Amino acid sequence: MAKAFRKSKSFSIDLSADASTIAVDLLRVLKSRYDYKALSTITGIPVSTLTRYITGKTAPRASKAERLLKNLLENVNLAALISENAGYNGGVDLAAVMLNPNILKIIGAHILEEFSGMKITAILPLDILSIPLASYLSTAISRPMYLLSSEPITADGHSIPIIFREDGRGSAKAYWLLIRRNCKSDSVLTISTQVPDPCLFNTLIEILAENKIDLGGFFTVIAEEEKLRRLKIPPGVRRSYIILA
């Protein structure tokens, strides 16, 4: 998977570079849920060809691989898959989803498709359950990962305190943002399981702007519409979610 995407000079996410690796990866994940006949119906690819792909005897190439990847993502009901694994019924425990490597591969592919062609130079998980997904993406597209922590972080980087008040009142809380040195002109993709606290997020956006870092994209697995409206996401920034609550 780590070799499936090459880092371009523009730092945009490039789905055309060896997409066969992740397409086959997804086929193998889906094979655990469907038989070859069902997969053939979904993809329009003969069973014999699917067998060769999944067993590693051959692999789709170039534009064919990219078309296959898009076809797979269009035919996977991610919202239903997440609901099924997390028992979503208005309240949800996402640990079963975000710690499942097979589901992470599908969500990761979905994110790469959503933000394909956009300048992304770093990945920033906003909650603890989104760290595995952020790590997967960071490895997949060879981008550094920022960290946001409720505890001070000591590392070879630049740690910035973020002071905010939940719901704009009460006692002040502090988080720490760990970014790389020489981060000016970075464009960050934030990853979260649910919509982050608006006060924390809006303060984070201010801190990023002060350090000449752009918000390149916003992704959350589950979006609560009321909280989403309170986020000060800059105009033109792509936002993406799987389930709207």
Go through the PLM ranges and name each one.
Residues 133-141, 204:
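Short Gly/Thr/Asp-enriched flexible loops that form oxyanion-binding sites at enzyme active sites
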Residues 10-33, 37-38, 52-119:
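Active-site-facing substrate-recognition patch
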Residues 119-129:
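Short glycine-rich phosphate-binding loop at a beta-alpha junction
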Residues 142-189, 198, 202:
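Short, glycine/charge-rich flexible loops or terminal/linker lids adjacent to PRPP-binding catalytic cores
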Residues 2-22, 203-245:
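PRPP-dependent phosphoribosyltransferase catalytic core
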Residues 41:
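Alpha-helical residues within the helix-turn-helix
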Residues 121, 186, 216:
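Conserved acidic residues
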